[in-house]
Amino acid sequence: MRPVRIIGAQGSHAGSINSTFHCTDVKVNGAWVRESEDDSGIILRYWDGHWRVQRRQDIEADPTMSMARLAAPDARPPLLLKKASEWQVYCHKDKTWIFKH
């Protein structure tokens, strides 16, 4: 699978999010997880039919709640993220979104 390039992210994590993600040997819901080549702490992860950019440390700390940004229904480069204020915390337990700025 080819690498995916993410562009257009803003905010404090933009430097690590705007990078190239390469495929790993990990699968989530039948889709490959992609890790950032610039920052191994950021991954592009498939969940509920969508790709999300997430911080690995958040997932490891609490798998039910993690920093997530809906990227696209299909990870075809380039993915364009919107402004940082649209980043959200998604709680998998009750399928709700909590907005964080």
Where are these regions (language model features)?
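Interface elements of modular peptide-recognition networks comprising either
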Residues: 1-101
